[in-house]
Amino acid sequence: MLTKRIIPCLDVKEGRVVKGIQFVSIRDAGDPVELAKFYDEQGADELVFLDISASHEGRETMIEVVQQTAATLAIPFTVGGGIRTLDDMKRILRAGADKVSVNTSALERPSLIQEGSDFFGAQCIVVAIDARYSEEDGTWMVYTHGGRNKTTWSAIDWAKEAVRLGAGEILLTSMNQDGEKSGFDLGLTKAVREAVSVPVIASGGAGYAEHFYEVLAEEVDADAALAASIFHYKETSVAQVKEYLRAKGVAVR
């Protein structure tokens, strides 16, 4: 039986970790390499770094963060944000990341998924999907540019297409739930999980240990659950979440 993964997410801006609530207000949560080390010691299975720097300087700083993190971490980590070309992927992976995550760039140019998958293997390519439920469409729709622009893709169709093109994993964020701490979007996660053959990481909405249980248990069956603020501000710890899951019979490392 495959163990379920708990993944802290670190949003990095100009070399510092920050966390927004519903993609807007930002608080400073510290040094990325120190935090990564802390989470490794806490028993995190993986980490995700999302580079939200807009500047070229910020992007260069991110390469340094990746190199330093790779030198101190034993667990795998993924880097996303600003990856638009195969060369961008090469730089991040050569700096020491295990996987790259693409979002807006993949929707703008879907062949990017295939290029990365052909060159590095599907296991290195994560497609991140930001989805919001639309009453008008009666389903979850995909948004780009940090949740600002609505696309014509439903989350289910885009996840299927991303996998067809070579994505090895889907990182699925519910924009409705993001930062709310009221639980993951179980309907969205289950729908995408059932539509694709690759692992799905649920993101957006974790507030308590039981929220991880809800999304990882058999009913929804996400492969991994990601959270940021509840870990950064020490509202709960990776170790506590895993202890809770073990007690509930969920297989964790």
Curated annotation (Swiss-Prot):
Key words of the record: Amino-acid biosynthesis, Cytoplasm, Histidine biosynthesis, Lyase
Pfam family name, one: His_biosynth
GO biological process: L-histidine biosynthetic process
Superkingdom, taxonomy of origin: Bacteria
InterPro entries per the UniProt record, alphabetical: Aldolase_TIM (IPR013785), His_biosynth (IPR006062), HisF (IPR004651), IGPS_HisA/HisF (IPR050064), RibuloseP-bd_barrel (IPR011060)
Compartment annotation: Cytoplasm
Active site: 11, 130
Primary location group: cytoplasm
Cytoplasm keyword on record: yes
Matching Gene3D superfamilies: Aldolase class I
The protein's annotated pathway: Amino-acid biosynthesis; L-histidine biosynthesis; L-histidine from 5-phospho-alpha-D-ribose 1-diphosphate: step 5/9
Alphabetical list of PANTHER family matching this protein: IMIDAZOLE GLYCEROL PHOSPHATE SYNTHASE HISHF, IMIDAZOLE GLYCEROL PHOSPHATE SYNTHASE SUBUNIT HISF/H IGP SYNTHASE SUBUNIT HISF/H
Entry function: IGPS catalyzes the conversion of PRFAR and glutamine to IGP, AICAR and glutamate. The HisF subunit catalyzes the cyclization activity that produces IGP and AICAR from PRFAR using the ammonia provided by the HisH subunit.
Subunit annotation: Heterodimer of HisH and HisF.
Family in the record: Belongs to the HisA/HisF family.
Protein name, per record: Imidazole glycerol phosphate synthase subunit HisF
Organism: Lysinibacillus sphaericus (strain C3-41)
Gene: hisF
